[in-house]
């Protein structure tokens, strides 16, 4: 599925272009992925999101 609308990472404006016309920042798709209760990889996405938000100076290791 192709999404038309994109959101600028820098300024947060919405546009239809790949580069923001206001600040020349990179744009991404603002829509979340589709939810499926049978998703096998949700564990890995949540883990990646949590480690991305957590400061790396803690030095803790995550195990499954």
UniProtKB/Swiss-Prot annotation:
A Gene Ontology cellular-component term: ribonucleoprotein complex
GO terms under biological process: pseudouridine synthesis; rRNA processing
Question: NCBIfam families in the record, alphabetically?
Answer: PRK13130.1
Protein family = Belongs to the NOP10 family.
Enumerate the UniProt keywords alphabetically.
Ribonucleoprotein, Ribosome biogenesis, rRNA processing
Gene name of the encoded protein: nop10
Q: Which InterPro entries match?
A: H/ACA_rnp_Nop10, H/ACA_rnp_Nop10_sf, Nop10_arc-typ
State the function annotated in the UniProt record. Answer: Involved in ribosome biogenesis; more specifically in 18S rRNA pseudouridylation and in cleavage of pre-rRNA.
SUPFAM superfamilies associated with the record: Nop10-like SnoRNP
Query: Can you name this protein?
Result: Ribosome biogenesis protein Nop10
Annotated Gene Ontology MF terms? snoRNA binding
Which Pfam families does the entry link to? Nop10p
Q: Which domain of life is it from?
A: Archaea
The SS bond pairs are none
């Amino acid at each position: 599925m192709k999404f038309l609308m994109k959101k600028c990472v820098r300024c947060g404006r919405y546009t239809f272009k790949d580069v923001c016309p206001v600040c020349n920042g990179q744009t991404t798709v603002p829509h979340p992925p589709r939810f499926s209760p049978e998703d096998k990889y949700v564990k890995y996405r949540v883990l990646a999101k949590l480690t991305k938000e957590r400061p790396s100076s803690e030095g803790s290791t995550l195990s499954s």
